[in-house]
Swiss-Prot record:
The gene is kdpB. The system is composed of three essential subunits: KdpA, KdpB and KdpC. The active site is at residue 307. One of its GO terms (molecular function) is magnesium ion binding. It comes from Leptospira interrogans serogroup Icterohaemorrhagiae serovar copenhageni (strain Fiocruz L1-130). It is a multi-pass membrane protein. Its main location: membrane. Belongs to the cation transport ATPase (P-type) (TC 3.A.3) family. Type IA subfamily. This is Potassium-transporting ATPase ATP-binding subunit. Part of the high-affinity ATP-driven potassium transport (or Kdp) system, which catalyzes the hydrolysis of ATP coupled with the electrogenic transport of potassium into the cytoplasm. This subunit is responsible for energy coupling to the transport system and for the release of the potassium ions to the cytoplasm.
Amino acid sequence: MNRESKVFIESPILKEAILNTFKKLHPFLQAKNPVMFIVFLGALFTTWIFFKDLYYGVYSSFNLQISLWLWFTVLFANFAEAIAEGRGKARTDSLKKTRSNIIAKKLVGNKIENVPGTLLKIGDIVICEAGDLISGDGEILEGIASVDESAITGESAPVVRESGGDRSAVTGGTKVLSDRIKISITAEQGRTFLDQMIALVEGAKRQKTPNEIALTMLLSGLSFIFLIAVMSLPLFAEFVAKEGGQSANLSIPILISLLVCLIPTTIAGLLSAIGISGMERLIRFNVISKSGRAIEAAGDIDILLLDKTGTITLGNREARDFYPAKGVDEKYLADVAQLSSLADETPEGRSIVILAKDKFGIRERNLSEMEGEFIPFSASTKMSGVNLKKEGKVVRKIRKGAGDSIRNYLHTLGQKISAELEETIQTISQRGSTPILITEEDRLLGVIELKDIVKGGLKERFASLRKMGIRTVMITGDNPLTAAAIAAEAGVDDFLAEATPETKLKKIREQQAKGYLVAMIGDGTNDAPALAQSDVGVAMNTGTQTAREAGNMIDLDSNPSKLIEIVEIGKQLLMTRGALTTFSIANDVAKYFAILPALFGSFYAVSEVGPLSALNLMKLGSQKSAVLSAVIFNALVIPALIPLALRGIVYKPLGADRILKRNLLIFGLGGMVIPFLGIKCIDLMLGFLGII
């Protein structure tokens, strides 16, 4: 997927944004932003005053220009939001093309019926073959296939989807490139992953986050204070003018202009654009966020919990070798291990079958012909296996599982693991592999080594997270020795071994109780409770449907190291909002000292050069020139900051104190200085052109 746009704003987006800019002038839409609503009402009122005066034969160039620039202020704020929404909508339009009328091959009994994909319901079984579009979200029941997911993820390379394990989920709208798979539909039409993506990336439907609401309330409060202050100015001006034998000349357009310049219009006009663009930047990195709150939380997380299988490792553990117990033939161990795995659809189970076949030429058998009863893996027992029957009676009971589970199983049968095999188990664990034990009846036959493969480049990425102040913890169901070896190889800070869904959930709640924000990355059904509890739950797109529904973010690339980009975007969002708020308030302070001296400089003196004129440090041309210059600057600063609001300020992994000082220097001091320079330049230009 192309992460960076060659053109900052593409032509189709620009055209639609301009159209939406005027559509957003609807009073109902304007009222959603209290600060800009004040500007909107001010523009309406000054426009009404201009036309009222014109009706009575009085033409005021000043009132006309004030009205126009107030309207420009509103339009520029609308344009900023429309551009942010348009960039997200471009992604939505491409997704909607994927959601076409797909004909599904629905399995009814033993027959296949062609039905519209829109009529499929949860639990329906469909068949997809090479060249077919998958008609809806589902889980693969049988088969393995190569799937083109470029319509969803933007990546051209096909991915493998197969039954069993954590790569069984398929997404509606993707295309099967090879083989044949049987799929059980898991989502109703209208609530599929594609439908969710379309709804999530449509900026117009984005809900404000709690921080945005709080900031909006703060800005509204400041605006109310300035409104009271401006309303009191005519009384003050009238009193001062009367004492000095002068007349106050504070017209309503001047007071409205002063109010608009003092309230924080800059951040108010860009606030929605900042939030929408944060979600849009995530989309460009192939991450879908279900809420703006999740992005904000990502910028503040302290601890990252990583599920090992499929997240830190490639997920497909492979059987590498057989280690028979004393007195057991290795070929016999391989034969029994294959029997226990014939009905095991997981990649690990199939690799055991293949290893036995490749090493000893043991061919697969049909369990049903052997009256075999498959015992599926259970998260509570951590064992699976098979019961072989003869004339309805169990004659062979085979089990395979992790060390502790088999150890407990043997203990109930009055048996234990020999010291020799314990040493073998420890050796396998210390090199980062997983030992799987095989038993027949009450006899331990030996150990299978399953090798985990750590994904490349993770160590460096975790080091970057450490610089950001984020602590990484690997969570795995493996024993402590295996977990320690993999944790060291991957470069995480800590690990939690022999974890169950309950212990994952407990770990997250413990850290949250200490005041930490926790992010969890996972892909399996057993990760779902932890993903739901986490402040930031990032589900892998290759994971199960349950995991994707539980998380509040979905990584379409299924790359756990992507969290670095997620964190940076979250921090960018918070820092950009804070920086522009600082800049906006500093602007207001500067405009206050720029305008008021020009307004009241003539008071207390018949010569119109009174004591207060000394405060007019900028030596602006006139009262009207000062007001108009400030209004023009106030309007132009919004489009000038749109690129920064959309791209976000550059984030570097520095300490919080250094970042604060840097932003105060750039946006605080800059926000104080720039208005003085800008207003003075505009004032000189107005004087040169003779507009005032």
